[in-house]
């Protein structure tokens, strides 16, 4: 069986980081975007994941290792983006969650219990370069920002992999935000003046 070419972890991490940073720069989160991309797959540097990749070993959580590195700077919401970059943004959970619960707290506890393979100490994972954030309850604005960062990371991850597999694929630039807003407004205008009997009640 002919073996497919393998993209190195370093190349994928750097490519994803640059793409994610460029996307996130649009709303002032370039540094967070870069770190999310740079560390989202740190867990692939574990012996467990390499066995999965090279020898069809058991499935391994590769998303939590990098998330925990970022979480050490109190960037919990960014860590949640990384933790869920394949499975979806996790609920943050509560202190009652046991290790392995499908929440941020559950996976954090599973990590602390060493039930998730650690990164191979011989792999040179770069340090997380983010300022520590004060611990506080997330606001609505932070919740929205988190979803934007999550979208940036998922898109960057997918596009970097696509580029490696298929080469550079030309993509349309799409319409700008002003054009899209006008199009949405025209669509919503249909409901401004109710004309049906039901809408007039």
What spans do the regions from the language model cover?
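Accessory nucleic-acid engagement/destabilization modules that flank
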Residues: 1-191
